[in-house]
């Protein structure tokens, strides 16, 4: 089975390559004043986040969300709520390289908060980026 490279070691640096988990073992040779030691660290690499371009409500009970396109990802997850703390938020998943989505069945005359994050599927597991900053919109 081929394992995808998650990180690359370059001198004394660990460079993220792809989303996923990697075990990195650090080894120190024995010296005159200390014994040899090694430590294994698990590193989780997540995709880069994206940002919202705009959230607009031009028709009743709907909002159109547009965002900046991210590279090398499987899709996006949009979260929206009437509460600014995003409690009881609903989610919409958009696969592929789309840069726009429409939120439907919203309540008219109410303010909604929207945020977005990217995800990458690696070996059947989804790795999510951090959330973007929130934008708000009043629904027509």
Segments from the language model and where they lie:
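Pro/Thr/Ser/Gly-rich low-complexity, intrinsically disordered linker/stalk tracts
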Residues: 46-72, 125-140
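Hydrophobic loop/turn residues within beta-sheet-rich immunoglobulin-like superfamily modules
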Residues: 17-19, 70, 106
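Short, solvent-exposed loop/turn segments at the edges of extracellular beta-sandwich modules
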Residues: 29-34, 121-127
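Beta-strand-rich modules
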Residues: 103-124
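Short S/T/G- and acidic-enriched coil/turn segments that sit immediately N-terminal to beta-strands
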Residues: 97-101
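Short beta-strand/loop motifs in extracellular/secreted proteins, especially
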Residues: 5, 74-76, 112
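Extracytoplasmic soluble-region selector
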Residues: 3-47
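Extracellular low-complexity, O-glycosylation-prone stalks/linkers
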Residues: 72-92
């Amino acid at each position: 089975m081929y394992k995808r490279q998650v990180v690359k070691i370059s001198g004394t640096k660990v460079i993220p390559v792809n989303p996923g988990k990697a075990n990195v073992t650090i080894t120190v040779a024995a010296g005159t004043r200390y014994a040899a030691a090694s430590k294994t660290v698990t590193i989780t690499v997540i995709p880069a986040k994206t940002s919202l371009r705009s959230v607009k409500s031009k028709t009743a009970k709907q909002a159109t969300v547009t965002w900046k396109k991210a590279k090398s990802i499987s899709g996006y997850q949009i979260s929206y709520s009437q509460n600014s703390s995003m409690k009881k938020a609903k989610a919409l998943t958009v696969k592929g390289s789309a840069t726009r989505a429409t939120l439907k069945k919203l309540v008219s005359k109410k303010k909604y908060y929207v945020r977005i994050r990217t995800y990458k599927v690696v070996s059947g597991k989804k790795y999510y980026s951090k959330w973007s900053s929130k934008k708000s919109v009043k629904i027509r």
